[in-house]
């Protein structure tokens, strides 16, 4: 599969999400902000972009631009992301944007591991965004292989040799008078992330919880079944067996379905044999 998307920050100004949708854009990855957990470093448009994306029915992901030079700074950046997400689970994941020249000499493997582990501990899907050159040099570590990659390579094809999920192929995608970074996603992220959430929810259920849920579902089913009227095809048989005392209905005089083999079906059988 191949799905068109864009990434958006405050530098794009006020974005027309309706125009994006009309142009065939299926997802957006929104900048949370940059660096450590300071409100002054939040992306000024993040909250508004989330509202607009959701109003347009567009699934979104999020990214944080990193300045972390060590694990401690990466922890603060993780807190920054989690504060802004406020319990949301973006259907296109949370990405750690590792590209700034100031961190070129840092222990990038440690900072990426720290940030991504914090996202996963919060039940979020985590990945790493970087240029092709950084992914094949500074970030080319087996320790980062478990994390999804979003590859920035403005080219006619992505030549990253390892598995990746998203390719940022241009910074010149023009839509509705605005210019965006254009991306292709090669995974069904909403399905993956929703399934991941279901597994996490199921993993936290005790045996008693499972039994309680099953009982509630069964009770709801039979309660709904009990409210159904006699089916038209069984009406004559029901009236006949009631009149002859072959069967009895409910205390209120009604004769609703009550089980998988319903009494109205039994009535039809008795009518045929009597």
Model-derived features with residue positions:
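Functionally critical loop-and-helix segments that line ligand-binding/catalytic clefts
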Residues: 1-12, 17-22, 140-205
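Substrate-binding cleft of extracellular glycoside hydrolase catalytic domains
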Residues: 1-125
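Short secondary-structure capping/turn micro-motifs that flank functional sites
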Residues: 36, 69-70, 135-136, 257-258
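Short beta-strand/turn micro-motifs composed of small residues
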Residues: 64, 130, 153
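Glycine-rich, charge-decorated loop segments at or immediately adjacent to ligand/cofactor-binding or catalytic sites
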Residues: 73, 134-144
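Aromatic-lined carbohydrate-recognition surfaces of secreted/lumenal glycan-active proteins
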Residues: 123-136
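Short, solvent-exposed alpha-helical surface patches in non-cytosolic proteins
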Residues: 203-274
